[in-house]
Amino acid sequence: MNSLNINLLYIAATIMMGLAAIGAAIGIGILGGKFLEGAARQPDLIPLLRSQFFIVMGLVDAIPMITVGLGLYILFAVAS
């Protein structure tokens, strides 16, 4: 592989991991805001909302973890 292709792989992996982190941060911020909004409107449903919040937060966090794994694979397995 020539150096231009390797440099493009480094840039692609970096952009992929960065955008995944930014997307997760925005998603968790929106999710937390909606949780607080729902808890303020109906305090009786806080246990139900909390369990749903943590399930969805785990799903939102799983996507960047997978993306970081793929990015590291590109950096260390494909580009070397």
Swiss-Prot record:
InterPro entries: ATP_synth_csu_bac/chlpt, ATP_synth_F0_csu, ATP_synth_F0_csu_DDCD_BS, ATP_synth_F0_csu_sf, ATPase_proteolipid_c-like_dom, F/V-ATP_Csub_sf. One of its GO terms (molecular function) is lipid binding. It is found in: Cell membrane. Keywords: ATP synthesis, Cell membrane, CF(0), Hydrogen ion transport, Ion transport, Lipid-binding, Membrane, Transmembrane, Transmembrane helix, Transport. PROSITE patterns: ATPASE_C. F(1)F(0) ATP synthase produces ATP from ADP in the presence of a proton or sodium gradient. F-type ATPases consist of two structural domains, F(1) containing the extramembraneous catalytic core and F(0) containing the membrane proton channel, linked together by a central stalk and a peripheral stalk. During catalysis, ATP synthesis in the catalytic domain of F(1) is coupled via a rotary mechanism of the central stalk subunits to proton translocation. Key component of the F(0) channel; it plays a direct role in translocation across the membrane. A homomeric c-ring of between 10-14 subunits forms the central stalk rotor element with the F(1) delta and epsilon subunits. HAMAP family: ATP_synth_c_bact. This is ATP synthase subunit c. It comes from Baumannia cicadellinicola subsp. Homalodisca coagulata. The gene is atpE.
